[in-house]
């Protein structure tokens, strides 16, 4: 059997970006044949990626990029918070955000097919899955193309905001983006709040008002008042400015001779149901999997 040297392991790792121990195992199995070891490793990493594909990705990061006339937010998901802090994972997220801004893909499928480092984005993603050992998915992205100004704000990589605005002061854009991250409005103005949210709030208000025992006309006014209050609370322009609650965002913008055209807010894992396995079930699953090997 051929001797497996450290330089051989390093060479294979450079070619495949696989973990050191996996490289050594592949070289041992291939009896030192570099080409065969590379093939074995790619098959193994491919299998690893396939097994990971069914696992829930509710952790991750939001990455942003702003270019000359376009900016983007991307949510990249993984399975654990540990991987969300991985340098390679974060570098991939930033690269994907730049691709979205510069290449303008129609959707995640089109983004995944874009070329990247001699491969496609999806091939790079799968290689990262094999290297890290967790499922990784590009969940969503948003792209703003405009001749106006763009501002972004990231809060701990888990909350991301992009804002399109006009006005001379760049600090205004930064302040609005930070405010959106903190207060999480659902729309720019009250008349843009989704109808289903308004209807849901109205039903809740009707139930509460009905319990008051007041006359029908009073109940109707109470319901309308509750809905109007809700609309102000969830629309950006009507919210009290987080850095000065004596004025609304609309008043702050007017004072700065600025305006916001639109914004987008991403929160990592929002709407994704996390898998909840108890410890006993997890151990049982691992034992069952071991018996099948």
Curated annotation (Swiss-Prot):
Q: Name one Pfam family in it.
A: EF_TS
Origin: domain of life: Bacteria
Keywords (alphabetical) are: Cytoplasm, Elongation factor, Protein biosynthesis
Where would you say this protein principally sits, based on its record?
A: cytoplasm
Give the UniProt subcellular location, in the record's own words: Cytoplasm
User: Gene3D superfamilies annotated for this entry?
Assistant: 1.10.286.20, DNA helicase RuvA subunit, C-terminal domain, Elongation factor Ts, dimerisation domain
Give one GO term, molecular function aspect.
translation elongation factor activity
The question of whether Protein biosynthesis is a record keyword is answered with yes
Q: Determine if Zinc is one of this entry's keywords.
A: no
Region Involved in Mg(2+) ion dislocation from EF-Tu: start-end pairs: 80-83
> Which InterPro entries does the protein's record reference?
EF-Ts_dimer_sf, Transl_elong_EFTs/EF1B, Transl_elong_EFTs/EF1B_dimer, Transl_elong_Ts_CS, UBA-like_sf
Gene Ontology CC terms:
cytoplasm
The role this protein plays is: Associates with the EF-Tu.GDP complex and induces the exchange of GDP to GTP. It remains bound to the aminoacyl-tRNA.EF-Tu.GTP complex up to the GTP hydrolysis stage on the ribosome.
Its family remark reads: Belongs to the EF-Ts family.
Give the matching HAMAP family: EF_Ts (MF_00050)
| Protein name in the entry | Elongation factor Ts
Q: Which gene encodes it?
A: tsf
């Amino acid at each position: 059997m051929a001797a497996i040297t450290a330089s051989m392991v390093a060479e294979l790792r450079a070619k495949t970006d696989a973990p050191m121990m996996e490289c050594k195992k592949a070289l041992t199995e291939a009896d030192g044949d570099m080409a065969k070891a590379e093939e074995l490793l790619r098959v193994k990493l491919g299998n690893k990626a396939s097994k990971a594909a069914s696992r829930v990705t509710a952790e991750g990061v939001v990455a942003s990029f702003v270019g000359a006339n376009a900016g983007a937010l991307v949510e990249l998901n993984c399975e654990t918070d540990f991987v969300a802090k991985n340098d390679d994972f974060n570098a991939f997220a930033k690269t994907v955000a730049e691709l979205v801004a510069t290449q303008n893909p129609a959707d995640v499928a089109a983004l995944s097919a874009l070329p990247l480092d001699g491969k496609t984005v999806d091939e790079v993603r799968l290689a990262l899955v094999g290297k890290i050992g967790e499922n990784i998915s590009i969940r969503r992205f948003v792209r703003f193309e405009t001749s106006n100004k763009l501002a972004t704000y990231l809060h701990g990589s888990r909350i991301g905001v992009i804002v399109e605005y006009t006005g001379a002061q760049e600090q205004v854009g930064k302040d609005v983006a930070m405010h959106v991250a903190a207060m999480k409005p659902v729309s720019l103005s009250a008349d843009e709040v989704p109808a289903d949210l308004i209807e849901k709030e109205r039903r809740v208000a009707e139930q509460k008002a009905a319990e008051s025992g007041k006359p029908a006309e009073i109940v109707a006014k109470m319901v309308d008042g509750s809905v109007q209050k809700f609309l102000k609370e969830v629309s950006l322009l009507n919210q009290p400015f987080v850095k000065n609650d004596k004025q609304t965002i609309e008043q702050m913008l007017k004072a700065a001779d600025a305006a916001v055209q639109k914004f987008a807010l991403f929160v990592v894992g929002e709407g994704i149901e996390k898998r909840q396995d108890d410890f006993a079930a997890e151990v049982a699953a691992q034992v069952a999997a071991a018996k099948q090997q």
